[in-house]
């Protein structure tokens, strides 16, 4: 106020009092403590003389105010008290202005006014371009820049431009890594105040924004705005490229980048670029290992708040999203959205390289890496690289053996959530995916997709090497490895490598002994769910796969597929070493081990090595005595299921496989194939020791025991060891008297099926083998092979002790006992021992008095057929054995042998 103007009307003290009252009336809300007059400004005389009447007072007042207010925290002059108070609250953190609706406090009255507009729903500012409404004029101006593309704020470091100065300021923190905002409760620092506020809301659970329609509350006003559009159905943004309508401008901006391919947000660590900044923020946490969001129930930490939000539903069991088609519920709306495409068949994302379409954009991105070969995620333990971070995370659990997913019903833990879900479906029987063509239901959507290709015949993948067409990309990738020989999946226990990760997983269970799949009927456990699925058909008797050629049915489609090759003669798998072809890839693999000598499976009991795990399993059953497969007809139990099948066919007489050369029928295709080698003379398996060749690899294996003298099969009752399991079984039958094979014609029983088969030919008179040399007809292939050696003089079985050779291996075995003194067959009555079971068999007749052979001439009976044969010569007068020295004749060769000693004078042998 000007002293020249006022001194005529008021005294000086009165003017000063009036000034103070005016100031305090204007700023009465601020409090006396916040006002401080500067030195030299306590009187009104400091103002120079001003011209004017009453207006001079206000002018003088405004001029004086610029000098009288200062901040207590630091010496700073303000032109108005409001600025002084604002600076002070910035230092103290005071929030004087409180919202009556939600209780939130603010430092500035203008912020409170702005906040109240959220509750009132007031949006007075409208965009002329799109018609979008805003609560504040600044937001409208900001929004207009989307349409104009104006970005006046540029980063000097990287050249990136922004439409807001605040965005530029926040962006600069990426370069200098500044974190200006700290959480008071947890001492965490953030680069942006919004991140700090979001972090606080997670811990406090504060959700101030509530939907008027349904009452749902949100942490952020933007989330509420987005949610409200669900009720209104408002989608104001339409994409010119694909026609998609989108509800928010930010989502619209992100969507446009799908078409342009723009990825403006780049990671400084690895150089990977992203189309949205939030994805970059989430990606950075891969490098930093930061997981700021922790579950209060189980303590699990997450990189993203959204993942924590969804994770909580595991504990609550909440699945708020329901499919209208099948009623399936989901924890996330995104999963429901993707699930619906199963019913609609929609696949909007297409690969430009191969034309394959996908229901999810992430699946397309994942697929593209097949073509590029990109594997950016590397394991620090073993160096293995992956094309997705989830695969790397899952892989790491191999090293850590972490199993975070536990089945609540059965307590089993799994390393992958997919394995847990699969495990649950096995027990619940849930099959949500149904084929529209035939109604068949499946546990997994991928199984349904694979099945649907049966109806469509679609096989989009063709192998350039062999021309094979394949239905799925994963199967195609596996198939290519057959030609390349690539085995990228290696077992850390034994070093064995595999072409697929699933095969490695199954293989690992050999080392761990894990058998997670259990049969509900018999309790038998399996390493693979597929084997359990097929095993169940043993109990149900289901054989859904039928051969069109011969009508034979199978439990597995794979068995039918292989079986068809018997009719077609197809052998697509060829050995590069010897050129031999096979109908099955597994047979080729097994055959290759003959050349390599590879034996990966070792028996812990006896230390023996095996080529196949099934052989090892079979060996184990010898020691455990386990025989899980039981015949329903006679109750006999078997160790391998193949023996039960063989036994069943003997009882039923089933012989589906017939030889085109001689008409002989067999119960198994392998027996037919083996038989064919008699006609072809094929013997591909050769012994390195003696050069002897065999038609079967197992015959070669057993033959080698002649040289090594290995006897792996031991009788538990008597302690005797044998080189062959058949010899052990035969030995056991001698002691037990077990005779399981009965002739339907005469009722005679036999210990071995081969003996029954030989016996039956007496009734049928069937003798399919005819000798070209002498015309003799013979009943069995083994006897025919022995007979031919009479003409050829071949004696391939040689005694290592004395060098004597024999025409058959059985004769050699019997001969060896002369040197060893071994007499394995003992009479239970008198304890006498014999070298051969046949001699024991005849000896027993002494005790039983049995004489089954009767002379037709005189009625005399004999224990042995040989004795009857010799006796008959008395009636006929036949004496076929002649002495070369004196011409005397004899009925028996033994008598001739004794007579010769008269001429030689040898008295060492007496008859």
Curated annotation (Swiss-Prot):
Mention any one GO cellular component term assigned to this protein in its UniProt record. nucleus
Q: Which SMART domains match?
A: ZnF_C2H2
The biological processes this protein is annotated with in GO are: regulation of transcription by RNA polymerase II
Q: Which compartment or compartments is the protein found in?
A: Nucleus
Q: Which Gene3D superfamilies match?
A: Classic Zinc Finger
Q: Which GO terms describe its molecular function?
A: DNA binding; zinc ion binding
Show the cross-link location (Glycyl lysine isopeptide (Lys-Gly) (interchain with G-Cter in SUMO2)): 478, 649, 786
Record keywords, A-Z: DNA-binding, Isopeptide bond, Metal-binding, Nucleus, Repeat, Transcription, Transcription regulation, Ubl conjugation, Zinc, Zinc-finger
Which function does this protein serve? May be involved in transcriptional regulation.
Instruction: State the PANTHER family in the record.
Output: C2H2-TYPE DOMAIN-CONTAINING PROTEIN-RELATED, ZINC FINGER AND SCAN DOMAIN-CONTAINING
Q: Which family does it belong to?
A: Belongs to the krueppel C2H2-type zinc-finger protein family.
Its name, as the record gives it, is Zinc finger protein 721
Q: What organism does the record attribute this protein to?
A: Homo sapiens (Human)
Q: Which gene encodes it?
A: ZNF721
